Swiss-Prot record:
Glycans are attached at N109. One of its GO terms (biological process) is selenium compound metabolic process. One of its GO terms (molecular function) is selenium binding. Belongs to the selenoprotein P family. It is found in: Secreted. Residues 221-237 have a biased composition (Basic residues). This is Selenoprotein Pa. Coiled coil: none annotated. The keyword Transmembrane does not apply. GO terms for cellular component: extracellular region. Keywords: Glycoprotein, Secreted, Selenium, Selenocysteine, Signal.
Length: 367
């Protein structure tokens, strides 16, 4: 019996003993065929490094990811990595199809596919989940299948995966790869690695020490993404929020890995509009305000809050026109950050909502 158990354990270690063995087995292989109508996106992209993001239009985090994907495209082109095909495949569930335009508005030079419901699910075909990003070489072979938290585009993992695929022939030689493309890659690498002339600086022992610490940290971070597909335990946060002035019920905020690194992004810093109060002279209470459209990806360390949510410790003032939704505990979900209620001497100034010019998505309502 122990002999059989040992053999089973050994086999588990060999194949990974997890759902990730399917992803590993797909590496350097052509993807299963999937279509959107009569279009075969992967065949059309042959000859280019291809990046496919699986996003959901009803997910606020996904919309932010879509915007950052545009930024990544421009960044890589400026660094000398052209001719990369980027595409996004929307989820086929009803809410995502209905809000397809929200995703489209955030993708400038990137093709967005709305699935044909009469055809097989394109996500299932490649074993993709929401927020996954897959990278393919010029011959259409899978080089990276990245999942949260490694697909957060403010982190370097996706960018590095694209660069490695572009330059390193991860799956061997490719007949669709030209010498000119490899020369482009060489130039881009040389440009990135070009030494930067340092300005003269005073020598301080503790500064030297700090520099080495940061260098070591960067080195650890650079090597930390070679196995980005482990940790697929997800937590789905579902709340009612206002997206583009359309109230959605039970919007899925995305999968958050249990071991996700915490990122502290204060709500006030990322607020998009504020309610202003004018106080009579002599008022000794602080001015109250409510900040809308908080863009906090994760809560404070160890608090277990769901991605995409912003919480307050005080109840929202009744006079605040922010579109936050209260729970019974008076916490505000996603769109608002609270301040203490305004003193009696304060009145709402006009206009009550200060939004960026031309911003139709501002969540404040005018009285």
């Amino acid at each position: 019996m122990w002999k059989a158990l040992s053999l089973t354990l050994a086999l588990c270690l060999l194949v990974g003993c997890s759902a990730e063995s399917e992803t590993e087995g797909a590496r350097c292989k052509l993807p299963p065929e999937w279509k959107v109508g009569d279009v075969e996106p992967m065949k059309n992209a042959l000859g280019q490094v291809t990046v496919v993001a699986y996003l959901q239009a009803s997910u606020l985090f996904c919309l932010e990811q879509a915007s950052k994907l545009n930024d990544l495209l421009l960044k890589l082109e400026n660094q000398g990595y052209p001719n990369i095909a980027y595409m996004v495949v929307n989820n086929r569930e009803e809410r995502s199809q209905r809000l397809h335009h929200l995703l489209q508005e955030r993708l400038l030079n990137i093709t967005l596919y709305a699935q044909d419901l009469s055809q097989p699910d394109a996500w299932q075909a490649v074993n993709a989940e929401k927020d996954d990003i897959l990278v393919y070489d010029r011959c259409g072979r899978l080089t990276y299948h990245l999942s949260l938290p490694y697909t957060i585009l403010s982190h370097p993992h996706v960018e590095e995966a694209i660069k490695h695929t572009y330059c390193d022939r991860i799956c061997g030689e490719c007949s669709l790869e030209s010498s000119a493309q490899l020369e482009e890659c060489k130039k881009a690498t040389e440009e990135v690695n070009k030494p930067v002339e340092e300005e003269p600086r005073q020598d301080h022992g503790h500064h030297e020490h700090g520099h080495h610490e940061h260098q070591g940290e960067a080195e650890r971070h650079r090597h930390g993404h070679h196995h980005p597909h482990h940790h697929h335990h997800h937590h789905r946060g579902q709340q009612q929020v206002d997206v583009d002035q359309q109230v959605l019920s039970q919007v899925d905020f995305g999968q958050v890995a249990v071991e996700t690194p915490m990122m502290k992004r204060p709500u006030a810093k990322h607020s998009r509009u504020k309610v202003q109060y004018s106080u009579q002279q002599g008022a000794d209470s602080p001015v109250a305000s409510u900040c809308u459209h908080u863009r906090q990806l994760f809560g404070g360390e160890g608090n277990g809050r769901v991605a995409g949510l912003u919480h307050c410790d005080e109840p929202l003032p009744a006079s605040u026109p922010u579109q936050g939704l209260k729970e019974q505990d008076n916490h505000i979900k996603e769109t608002u950050q609270u301040r203490p209620a305004p003193p009696a001497e304060u009145e709402l100034s006009q206009p009550t909502u200060v939004u960026p010019a031309g911003d139709a998505t501002u969540g404040u309502r005018k009285k």
